[in-house]
Amino acid sequence: YLLATSLTNAALTMDIRLVELVSHLGQQLSEGEIIQLSNTNASDFSEAVYFDVIKKKTAALFSTAAAAGAKSVHSTDEIAKKAALIGELIGIAFQIKDDIFDYNASDELGKPTGNDMKEGKLTLPALYVLNTYQDSSMIDLALKIRALEASDEEIARFIDYVKQHGGLEYAS
């Protein structure tokens, strides 16, 4: 809904550059979601896939917002590209920080611990630990998490393992 509304609003500006930006965002978001969904049964734990997904989703949102802001005040294409790059980098940093928050309970954030894992998502801290330590029992548990078959207790055990093995420090 929000993307469709954004596209409508971009069209109302009569600025084809904004329409192209929002249309491209829709394509990127769709590609990111497809990559993420196709990775749910993967037996590997690729950081490259993780970064591809966040670049096409969160970072694309930030990048488009920054570029649209620049273009809406009639900046040059060069300035708009720089704004888009800054937005992309902020989006990547934002997503990694959000993923780190998933390892710590906080009423302030309104995000329960392990929420990403309860949705079958393994993020940068977990990927680092899985690839670095190659612990077969944790790999099996990670596959269970991806398949949405892990209990809350198993997710809590996995979170502790990631924290104890430097996953949060790596992602920071």
Regions found by a protein language model. Give the residues of each.
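All-alpha prenyltransferase/terpene-synthase fold signal
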Residues: Y1-S172
